Amino acid sequence: MLKMGVVLFVFLVLFPLATLQLDADQPVERYAENKQLVSPYERRQIILHALGQRQCCDWQWCDGACDCCA
């Protein structure tokens, strides 16, 4: 009888709770899909801003003092 109670608890309480948590991921996925439409230049600017780098040097003139973006 105890085993049946545990099985019922798992399927009636824990399983629905686990499936409801999956719904919370949808806004993040939708945001990621919208970000795929950003041009490569805009994407690079977003990444550089997040990393704290404001300017890119030309790869031909790059020395050890700058971070190249190309």
Swiss-Prot record:
Protein's cellular compartments: Secreted
Gene Ontology molecular function: ion channel inhibitor activity; toxin activity
InterPro entries in the record: Conotoxin (IPR004214)
Signal sequence annotation: 1-24
One Pfam family recorded for the sequence: Conotoxin
Alphabetized UniProt keyword annotations: Disulfide bond, Secreted, Signal, Toxin
GO cellular component, one term: extracellular region
Residue ranges the record assigns to the propeptide: 25-54
Cysteine-cysteine disulfides: C56-C66, C57-C68, C62-C69
Distribution of this protein across tissues and organs: Expressed by the venom duct.
Domain of life assignment: Eukaryota
Keyword Disulfide bond on entry: yes
Family statement: Belongs to the conotoxin M superfamily.
Domain remarks: The cysteine framework is III (CC-C-C-CC).
Protein name: Conotoxin TsMLKM-011
Organism: Conus tessulatus (Tessellate cone)
Lineage of producing organism: Eukaryota, Metazoa, Spiralia, Lophotrochozoa, Mollusca
